[in-house]
Amino acid sequence: MDYRKIEASDDKRIAEIIRANLERLHLNIPGTAYFDPELEHLSSYYNSDSSKRAYFVALDETGQVAGGVGIAEFDGIESCAELQKLYLDDSVKGKGFGKELMRIAEDWARSAGYRNLYLETHTNLSVALGLYKKMGFCQIEKPCSTPHSAM
């Protein structure tokens, strides 16, 4: 497996992976990443201000994009970045791609000067919840105010 920053040629595939995951879990509803206006062009969004955000993709053994994760400055909490849009193709789940993508995003956030990480998820995403807990995240009483209120 290989990892790199997102490129424009990855946009369509990442959008497909994100939407397929959300559809399968019946989370293709307003307030989720499914309806993010930047979903069709994540590379433009994340690469437009590379000091405050980044998106990394995972490549499978054939070199095809198999998933990704975003990290971006989180407004409202000092020195905080938000882990965003961690989704994998079904063919690579359970193979360590998610854990490695999280490690890459955390390393980027640390090198960019962030001291805290925040993420939002949904209770339907039990595998993701387990990964986040294993990676040291803890549940807070209520989410911060973000556009992804349904997550």
Language-model segments: residues:
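Residue-level detector of alpha-helical recognition elements and their boundaries
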Residues: I29, E78, G98, N116-E120, ...
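Conserved glycine-rich acetyl-CoA-binding loop
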Residues: Q64, L86-R103, D107-A112, N116-L117, ...
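Acetyl-CoA-dependent GNAT
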Residues: K5-Q84, D89-D90, M102-I104, W108, ...
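Extreme N-terminal starter segment of soluble prokaryotic enzymes
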Residues: M1-Y3
